[in-house]
């Protein structure tokens, strides 16, 4: 449980890092968005696949926590920019 919380917080930190560094110039927005969506879909596929989940449950839950933190952090940054 502690690893999932740490990975969620690491995902929030990573999203803040991605939003401030790579979008500074505006050139990386398309590539960064494509990589984030691909990473999100790969982690979702792995975490909801029953065969893989039975064998590596703890590692997959950690990656899923990172994914949740990343998306939540991006949502928070968008909310800050919108207000």
UniProtKB/Swiss-Prot annotation:
PANTHER family: PTHR33787, YCF20-LIKE PROTEIN. One of its GO terms (cellular component) is chloroplast. It holds the Pfam family DUF565. Its main location: plastid. Keywords: Chloroplast, Plastid. It is found in: Plastid, Chloroplast. Belongs to the ycf20 family. This is Uncharacterized protein ycf20. It comes from Galdieria sulphuraria. Although originally identified as Cyanidium caldarium, these sequences derive from Galdieria sulphuraria.
